[in-house]
């Protein structure tokens, strides 16, 4: 084998010659190989060992230029357009030959590609350096098939070139700042270097685990721009003021004790801390406070005053007359029976256990009506009697048989409820006329809207507009097109109108042909009715529609209840006087459901006759109570006015035993600002004596308006101003006033 030196240049020569043999026009951009500067071939006679002079010199400037151009070609090959042309120049030539040499066809195709990308706004940093429209601008404008002054082509070319240049500038700007950012980074620490080395070794071993990037710690340094957020306002520096306290303090009146806080404030827990209403917690969510340990309190000093106060007090006033040793059961029973008799004599007493009076129908057998199924089902008209003059008054409340006249006082049964139903309802009826009107037929099943009685009807307020008659003057020229033109008004019914006209709006509820008379008939004995109305009075029942709401403000009610005939004050008086008619005959009966009987027929005296409480008729109402005489109660109708300043001066003059002139002189000295020796209380004085002396020293009007609370409030003000000491007496009946220390 020969030396390897001569064989290497031969191989390189052959490869280079083969590379040069391919024309540039036949190669595509993706397959194009750019020739690199090769070292000069060594002579064949030189031995295999190379000599330093045979190697080319290192050109740094040329290498920098090649690196810059390599980026351009990389961007060129990475573009999306497959037919995008790249510069065919070689990097081995000098700088003057960097402009690519394209044919006219390639220039035209390159121009159309640039205009298309510019129109679609797809020029980015990736393909901006591969578009050579700026380099071939002059050749494009000077082509033979176009005119030299084609401004449309020039404008489009200039617009696309501007966009390409702008994107190139942005790309260079971004690269520069990226390089500057890399220069500003600190040197990696030893831990990061070890981490990179470990990651590199892991990658070499075939692992695909990515290195965990360390989290960057962002240091936020915020400087407040608004100075008002740093400064505290004057309102926040002040103590929080309670609005309830402001309102209470503003309404404080020196002339009365209503504004004293001690009488209005409350305590919340055992600490007896006075709290304003705004500070009181209605529902406390915290744990309740534990009570402190109760210690012993020394009460030896209070023993004597408490014993003195307890001597004059009664332990139980209700048992003050009770004696343990001298108590007698007979005397006690007599007092109790006298008290019970006193209550029994009252007219308003009601005894639910009272015995019912015997019925006038003596021939009727005993027993309840519900158990007698064999009784006659037809109405019995013989029980009414021959007194026809009472028939017109008794028929509305008359029952069909004597057994039904006595209605039991059962709770919630039909026999208790039916007598309350009146077919001629009035203002004292149990049910309202409007509710009873629902049984008048299908037309009245719906409740009617309530009519306004006071307000005048709307039909009266609206004036009737006179409609002008339509006349046609045959002698006048009338434009019939105006009357027969097509208007904008709809000629068909709308959808909403058709929906409203449904069967509910045009059809009455189903009529079940319910007979109202069955409501007052018994189920097992239809012939017996609980209520029956005379045929002559059936027409009069229609007057309920005219009944208006009861006016409770009428003069009869507002002036001492309802005036009328007074009931007898005593149970022994005759009740027949209440039923005497205008002619002297008995026109009404205390028994509205029974025929009247004389005292001789009944066997009882007139005093024994009374109202039957078990008969509930419409006219048998409760008698009105005894009318109370109108008694005028005298009370203070005007507010008391008191000059507190003058009252304090008078009280202070009495405490210091000064005359009137001396008190006025002291007041003048105080107003002038002169310093004078403060007067002191001469001797101990009592509040009761001060009040009596004030009534004599004050003017008549002020003396009349003076009261104990006002005098005590004035004394409290003086005690605060003059340093007085107030002490209570042992029996707490008076206040002792003396000069403080």
From Swiss-Prot:
Ranges of biased composition (kind: Acidic residues): 361-377
Chain positions found as Phosphothreonine: 49, 598, 605
GO terms under biological process: cell division; female meiosis chromosome separation; meiotic chromosome condensation; mitotic chromosome condensation; positive regulation of chromosome condensation; positive regulation of chromosome segregation; positive regulation of chromosome separation
Crosslinked residue numbers (Glycyl lysine isopeptide (Lys-Gly) (interchain with G-Cter in SUMO2)): 488
Cell location: Nucleus; Cytoplasm; Chromosome
Primary residence: nucleus
Chain positions with Phosphoserine modification: 15, 25, 28, 70, 78, 81, 87, 89, 92, 96, 201, 233, 432, 496
Residues the record lists as N6-acetyllysine modifications: 637
GO molecular function, a single term: chromatin binding
Subunit annotation: Component of the condensin complex, which contains the SMC2 and SMC4 heterodimer, and three non SMC subunits that probably regulate the complex: NCAPH/BRRN1, NCAPD2/CAPD2 and NCAPG.
Family, similarity comment: Belongs to the CND2 (condensin subunit 2) family.
Protein name per UniProt: Condensin complex subunit 2
Originating organism: Homo sapiens
Gene (name only): NCAPH
């Amino acid at each position: 084998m020969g030396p390897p030196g001569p064989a290497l240049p031969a191989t390189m020569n052959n490869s280079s010659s083969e590379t040069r043999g391919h024309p540039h026009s036949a190669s595509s951009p993706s397959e194009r190989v750019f020739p690199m500067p090769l070292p000069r071939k060594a002579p064949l006679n030189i031995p295999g060992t190379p000599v330093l002079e045979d190697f080319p010199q290192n050109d740094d400037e040329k290498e920098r230029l090649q690196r810059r151009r390599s980026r351009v070609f990389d961007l060129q090959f990475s573009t999306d357009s497959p037919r995008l042309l790249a510069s065919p120049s070689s990097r081995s030539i000098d700088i003057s030959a960097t402009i690519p040499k394209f044919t006219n066809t390639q220039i035209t195709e390159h121009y159309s590609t640039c205009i298309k990308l510019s129109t679609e706004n797809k020029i980015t940093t990736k393909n901006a350096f591969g578009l050579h429209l700026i380099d071939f601008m002059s050749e494009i404008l000077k082509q033979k098939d176009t005119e030299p002054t084609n401004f449309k082509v020039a404008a489009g070319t200039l617009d696309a070139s501007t966009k390409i240049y702008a994107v190139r500038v942005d790309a260079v700007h971004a690269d520069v700042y990226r390089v500057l950012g890399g220069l500003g980074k600190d040197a990696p620490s030893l831990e990061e270097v070890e981490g990179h080395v470990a990651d590199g070794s892991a990658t070499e071993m075939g692992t695909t685990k990515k290195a965990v990037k360390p989290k960057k710690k962002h240091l936020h340094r915020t400087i407040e721009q608004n100075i008002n957020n740093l400064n505290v306002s004057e309102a926040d520096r002040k103590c929080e003021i309670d609005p309830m306290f402001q309102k209470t303090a503003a309404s404080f009146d020196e002339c009365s004790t209503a504004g004293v806080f001690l009488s209005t404030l409350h305590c919340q827990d055992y600490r007896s801390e006075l709290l304003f209403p705004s500070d009181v917690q209605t529902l406390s969510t915290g744990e309740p406070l534990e009570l402190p340990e109760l210690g012993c309190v020394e009460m030896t000093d209070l023993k004597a005053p408490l014993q003195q106060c307890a001597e004059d007090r009664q332990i139980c006033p209700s048992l003050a007359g009770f004696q343990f040793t001298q108590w007698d059961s007979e005397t006690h029973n007599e007092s109790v029976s006298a008290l019970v008799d006193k209550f029994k004599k009252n007219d308003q007493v009601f005894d639910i256990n009272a015995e019912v009076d015997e019925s006038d129908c003596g021939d009727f057998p005993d027993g309840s009506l519900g158990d007698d199924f064999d009784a006659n089902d037809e109405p019995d008209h013989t029980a009414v009697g021959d007194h026809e003059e009472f028939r017109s008054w008794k028929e509305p409340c008359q029952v069909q048989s004597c057994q039904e006249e006595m209605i039991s006082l059962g709770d919630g049964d039909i026999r208790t409820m039916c007598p309350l139903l009146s077919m001629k309802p009035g203002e004292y009826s149990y049910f309202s006329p409007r509710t009873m009107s629902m049984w008048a037929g299908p037309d009245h099943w719906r409740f009617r809207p309530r009519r306004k009685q006071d307000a005048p009807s709307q039909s009266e307020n609206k004036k009737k507009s006179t409609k002008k008659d339509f006349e046609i003057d045959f002698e006048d020229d009338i434009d019939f097109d105006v009357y027969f033109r097509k208007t904008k008004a709809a000629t068909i019914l709308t959808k909403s109108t058709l929906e409203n006209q449904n069967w509910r709006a045009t059809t009455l509820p189903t009529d079940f042909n319910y007979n109202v008379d069955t409501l007052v008939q018994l189920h097992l004995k239809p012939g017996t009715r609980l209520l029956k109305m005379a045929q002559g009075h059936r027409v009069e029942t229609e007057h309920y529609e005219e009944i208006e709401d009861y006016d409770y403000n009428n003069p009869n009610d507002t002036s001492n209840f309802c005036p009328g005939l007074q009931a007898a004050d005593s149970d022994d008086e005759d009740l027949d006087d209440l039923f005497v008619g205008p002619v002297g005959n008995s026109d009404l009966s205390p028994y509205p459901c029974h025929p009247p009987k004389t005292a001789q027929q009944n066997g009882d005296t007139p005093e024994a006759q009374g109202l039957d409480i078990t008969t509930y008729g419409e006219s048998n109402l409760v008698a009105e109570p005894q009318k109370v005489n109108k008694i005028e109660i005298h009370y203070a109708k005007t507010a008391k006015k008191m000059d507190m300043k003058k009252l304090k001066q008078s009280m202070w003059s009495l405490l210091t035993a000064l005359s009137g002139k001396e008190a006025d002189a002291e007041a003048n000295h105080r107003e002038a600002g002169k310093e004078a020796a403060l007067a002191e209380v001469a001797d101990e004085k009592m509040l009761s004596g001060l009040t009596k002396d004030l009534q004599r020293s004050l003017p008549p009007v002020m003396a009349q308006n003076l009261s104990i609370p006002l005098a005590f409030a004035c004394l409290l003000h003086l005690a605060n101003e003059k340093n007085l000491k107030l002490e209570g007496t042992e029996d707490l009946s008076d206040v002792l006033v003396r000069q403080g220390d």
